[in-house]
Amino acid sequence: MYVQELEPVAGSLGLSALVAALPLVIVLVLLGGVRMKAHLAGLTGLLAAVLVAWLAYGMPLGQTLSSGAQGAVFGLFPILWIVVNALWVYRMTVRTRHFDILRRSFGRLSDDPRIQALVIAFCFGALLEALAGFGAPVAISAVMLVALGFEPVRAAVVALVANTAPVAFGAMGTPVVTLAQVTGLPLDSVASVVGRQTPLLALVVPLVLVWLVDGRRGLRETWVPALACGVAFAVAQFAASNYVSAQLADIGAALAGAGALVAVPRARVPAAESVRASVLTGVRSEELDEEDPPREVLRAYAPYALIVVIFSVAQIPPVKDWLARATQTFDWPFLNVAGPDGEPVGGNVFSWPVVSTGGTLVLLAGILTAAVIGVHARVAVREWLATVHELRFAILTVTSVLALAYVMNLSGQAATIGHFVAAAGAGLAFLSPVLGWFGVAVSGSDTSANALFGALQVTAARESGLSPELLAAANSSGGVLGKMISPQNLTIACAAVGLAGREGDLLRKVLPWSLGLLLVMCLIVVGQSTPVLGWMLP
């Protein structure tokens, strides 16, 4: 049995933490400084983690490699199993042009460009985040806004800032699923706390968006529908993440936000010509004026309706218990690890939820979607294989980063860093979202930041007497605010609207909002760690 040691380097916690942090530092420097491709940076960091575990911590090489293999397998199933199937559903709607029908349907909710920004970037973007993630919401929302006549820079900035509130539950809950796994905390517990943090951002972001579109006038004239949209989004995200399913949080929130905009009379008032003239300075696409049969509009919404129904049914206690029976649990081969206290760690056992996992439920929704929107079985299979091919580098990135995280967690590297960081004491609650923000700003992924920093956040929380669930959630909630400034997302936004090479211009425009909202999140977490806002936690 391998027993984790907290101070393997010269008996010093500080030196040990410095060595333990090397894999993380290497990944972040390669991504943010050298601008190396993410999958190569992940593999390099994994190699560093293996060497540190073996040479500095004395973990047997066989167990080190086995822990990395477990992380890679978890990356494939359930994480990438969810992502692949969700993106597959999206690709089928694109192939049949039902995606175009859906975006035209959203675009017709109002002719006011400020409301259109909310509908497309905030609500429709959240719907895309729920299924596709990985930069797709920013690219597609920005292109749609340009097609409406938005100036490219304004469209890109709006799309970037809007892609915040839904990120923690994106790709059918992938970030929080990863966070729960690497920390050993129950998914429901982690998701419920995240669902009491990011909805507070959702209250603010729509107001920020109308300001970005039309300044003080936009805020003065459209604050009522913007606030209604934010409140509906926040309530739905909170309710889904706490009482239904984390995987449904973004879908429910997106539809609720759009529904609120439809329900508020002020959102349907035509914009003054002076507003349209000052905001819509680009060229409008004629494609947006096409008329779609009501039957096809219903079919365009069908994939999302099917996902909501299937996930909701899966949460009914008898059904949930029946699905859970197929879960396979077994001791992971060549792995026998104990914590510093000599007790076996949870990582020795691997759980494989074959049927109840979100990816399998999305696969079922995808099969039904293919039938509803008229995709032949052979074409559906080709699209699924094409999805895997499209994600090949993302697959390598996710598996390498999760392998790295598992090596660090099981060797004791994460525990060492966590004990060292715990010295921050009460200030840890303020710094916790900053760590997640930094991780996403560099990696471009809330999932990666949760995999890298989730375990050390929990260790630090336990050592400092704070709630592990609170700091784990803060890592993800703070991380969503780093996405708008990540080089990956800036590049995607620039490419989508034809601003190649102008990432710096976008960064200067979104950085103040990223930092300002991060400060708000830090204060929320500090408040939740004290009696001031502690009542908000479950």
What do the PLM-derived regions correspond to, one by one?
Residues 8-22, 75-79, 131-137, 188-203, ...:
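Structural signature of hydrophobic alpha-helical transmembrane segments
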Residues 15-16, 27-63, 84-96, 264-270, ...:
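Structural signal for alpha-helical transmembrane segments and their membrane-water exit/capping regions
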Residues 77-79, 90-97, 127-137, 165-172, ...:
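Short helix-coil transition sites and intra-membrane helix breaks within transmembrane domains
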Residues 112-143, 147, 167, 395-407, ...:
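Hydrophobic alpha-helical transmembrane segments of multi-pass integral membrane proteins
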Residues 114-126, 152-165, 188-206, 399-400, ...:
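Alpha-helical transmembrane segments of multi-pass membrane proteins
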Residues 168, 172-278, 477-538:
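Juxtamembrane and boundary regions of transmembrane helices in multi-pass small-molecule transporters
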Residues 238-326:
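Active-site loops and adjacent core secondary-structure elements that bind or stabilize anionic groups
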Residues 290-435:
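Transmembrane helical segments that form the transport core of multi-pass membrane transport proteins
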